[in-house]
Amino acid sequence: MKNKRVETIVFNAIIAAIYIVFTLLFAPFSYSTKLLFIELRISEILLVLTFYNKKYGPGLILGCFVANLLGSDLGPIDWLIGTFQTALSILIYMCVKKLPLSNLKKVVIGSFVNALQCGLIIGSELTYVYCDSSNYFSFFILQFFGVFIGEIIILIIGIVIFEISFKNKELRRLMEIK
């Protein structure tokens, strides 16, 4: 029992480290600005992993917080809102997992809902921080679609990667994927 707990902590530390490295390595695409239309945070591919096993959620939440702490120009607002949004995504995957559908349908639905809520939450955050005009609605729509499109692309890539990877029975066993 104790070894499983240590194993889970180690897996989460690895996931957090990978999330941080990929977010910072691809920082120009990981963080939205007024000038960048589509936010492509490559590390969000790991978010799909929590659909298959929720125990990897803490690593993603920690990774998101540290990546935003180290790389985001938005400061404390992004540390809090970005981390909250990641936690909400994990919760959505946990809820969608209970639907009476095939796993593939559930992960696709969960990813779509997550991309929508990410666009709404992060789009609102970016509008609040960057919009310096009275045209908030137009600015928000641009930010929403930029984040939504980027997130849906990344989550689809994540679905493909994990669906293919988890055909390997040994990997499924190692990562406790049912």
Can you name each region flagged by the protein language model?
Residues 24-36, 65-178:
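Membrane-embedded alpha-helical hairpins and interfacial helices in multi-pass inner-membrane proteins
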Residues 1-58:
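Hydrophobic transmembrane alpha-helices
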Residues 49-61, 98-106:
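Membrane-helix interface "capping/anchor" motifs
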Residues 19, 60-68:
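Small-polar-interrupted transmembrane alpha-helices in polytopic inner-membrane proteins
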